[in-house]
């Protein structure tokens, strides 16, 4: 059964149970194994939002489900739709805390970026996600619920669109919430549930080297991305506090272990900050840094979304990005400049949540 986490006490979401845990719970409460399979089917294939909609489940067992669980624990607070089809959601958790989820329309399908923590303690100096420190982890049910509510949003439109890809790149450090994230990955990848292919799922870490090694041994065939953002220790430590604990030597040793163990490619995320990490010399350093794993690595150059609280940073001009890209390509680095999404809404990760919390505080002051 689910282990206790630092999540506050309230009725848990049934999404927090893996299929095996749901089977065990049903048997423990006097039902056959197939009953759990029926419930799983209602949750992930028919995608009901209430136990009362499960028409082939007895009223007594539905009452037991209602007594012990909720289906979806999230409340939709705000939805912002961009002209390019990007949708940003602000969800409220049962304890009143807020999280963000983003739906991006890609040429290959609908991709959802999920949040794994309320706030973030990694402390990257350019990032909106860390403006509010970590308050708690999300449990795996709260992470799964984000996917289910986004899918419900599209189900209600009746166009037959389905979430096909997941990126675990929202607020928080996924590997700082390792157990819940791993259960989430196995739930959404389950062939009897949402059945989102492992190669359609990407987990991004800021560089917790020991967790990268652990993840290599889990047998999950999802994609791994590393938020790199600088090609040397001095620069990386100045903009990403995590580098002081896991410097590049330790990080790249873990990445090499991951590649050797899984034979999977690693993507490096690199935000382009004007005059900070975007010189041709920085590009050459990056090419040299990744040379040993070039065949199984990829660099994603990311245009910076300005954050008012971090006004010391600005976006690299297009010509600087192109010059950086050219140096990488000349060195044989597989790289791309990321396509932007949702630039006409609160685009930066964590920005919608931060702005909403500011407005809520201002309203509270006015009401005093």
Swiss-Prot record:
Which of the seven top EC classes does this enzyme belong to? transferase
The chain positions of domain Radical SAM core read 106-344
Q: Which UniProt keywords apply?
A: 4Fe-4S, Cytoplasm, Disulfide bond, Iron, Iron-sulfur, Metal-binding, Methyltransferase, rRNA processing, S-adenosyl-L-methionine, Transferase, tRNA processing
SUPFAM superfamilies, per the entry: Radical SAM enzymes
Location in the cell reads: Cytoplasm
Q: What does this protein need as cofactor? A: [4Fe-4S] cluster
Disulphide connectivity of cysteines: 113-349
InterPro entries membership: Aldolase_TIM, Methyltransferase_A, RlmN_N, RNA_MTrfase_RlmN, rRNA_lsu_MTrfase_RlmN/Cfr, rSAM
CDD domains reported in the protein's UniProt record: Radical_SAM
Q: What's its EC?
A: 2.1.1.192
Q: Which GO terms describe its biological process?
A: rRNA base methylation; tRNA methylation
Any single GO molecular-function term of the entry would be:
metal ion binding
Q: Where is the active site?
A: 100, 349
What the entry lists under PROSITE patterns is as follows: RADICAL_SAM
Keyword check for Magnesium: no
Q: How is the cofactor bound?
A: Binds 1 [4Fe-4S] cluster. The cluster is coordinated with 3 cysteines and an exchangeable S-adenosyl-L-methionine.
Function field: Specifically methylates position 2 of adenine 2503 in 23S rRNA and position 2 of adenine 37 in tRNAs.
Any other comment in the entry?
Reaction proceeds by a ping-pong mechanism involving intermediate methylation of a conserved cysteine residue.
Q: Which family does it belong to?
A: Belongs to the radical SAM superfamily. RlmN family.
Name of this chain's protein: Probable dual-specificity RNA methyltransferase RlmN
Q: Which organism is it from?
A: Streptococcus agalactiae serotype V (strain ATCC BAA-611 / 2603 V/R)
């Amino acid at each position: 059964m689910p282990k206790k986490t630092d999540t506050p006490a309230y009725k848990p979401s049934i999404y927090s149970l893996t299929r095996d845990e749901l089977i065990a719970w049903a048997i423990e409460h006097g039902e056959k194994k197939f009953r759990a399979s029926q419930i799983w089917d209602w949750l992930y294939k028919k995608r009901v939002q209430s136990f009362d909609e499960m028409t082939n489940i007895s009223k007594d067992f539905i009452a037991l489900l209602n007594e012990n669980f909720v289906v979806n624990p999230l409340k939709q607070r705000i939805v912002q739709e961009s002209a390019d089809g990007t949708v940003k959601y602000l969800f409220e958790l049962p304890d009143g805390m807020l999280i963000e989820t983003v739906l991006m329309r890609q040429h290959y399908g609908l991709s959802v970026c999920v949040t794994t923590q309320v706030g973030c303690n990694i402390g990257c100096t350019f990032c909106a996600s860390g403006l509010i420190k970590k308050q708690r982890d999300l449990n795996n049910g709260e992470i799964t619920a984000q996917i289910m509510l986004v899918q419900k949003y599209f189900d209600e439109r009746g166009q037959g669109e389905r979430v096909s890809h997941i990126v675990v790149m929202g607020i928080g450090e996924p590997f700082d919430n390792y157990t819940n994230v791993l259960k989430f990955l196995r739930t959404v990848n389950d062939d009897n549930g949402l059945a989102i292919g492992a190669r359609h799922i990407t987990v991004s870490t800021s560089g917790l080297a020991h967790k990268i090694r652990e993840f290599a041994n889990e047998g999950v065939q999802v994609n791994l991305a590393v938020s790199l953002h600088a090609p040397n220790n001095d620069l990386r430590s100045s903009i990403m506090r995590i580098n002081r604990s896991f410097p590049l030597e330790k990080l790249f040793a873990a990445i090499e272990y991951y590649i050797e163990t899984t034979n999977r490619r690693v993507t490096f995320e690199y935000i382009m900050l004007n005059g900070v990490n975007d010189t041709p010399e920085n590009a050459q350093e990056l090419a040299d840094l990744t040379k040993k794993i070039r065949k199984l690595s990829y660099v994603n150059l990311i245009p910076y979304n300005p954050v008012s609280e971090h006004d010391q940073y600005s976006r690299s001009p297009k010509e600087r990005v192109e010059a950086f890209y050219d140096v990488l390509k000349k060195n044989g680095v597989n790289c791309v400049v990321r396509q932007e999404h949702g630039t006409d809404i609160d685009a930066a990760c964590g920005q919608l949540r931060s702005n909403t919390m500011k407005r809520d505080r201002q309203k509270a002051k006015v009401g005093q």
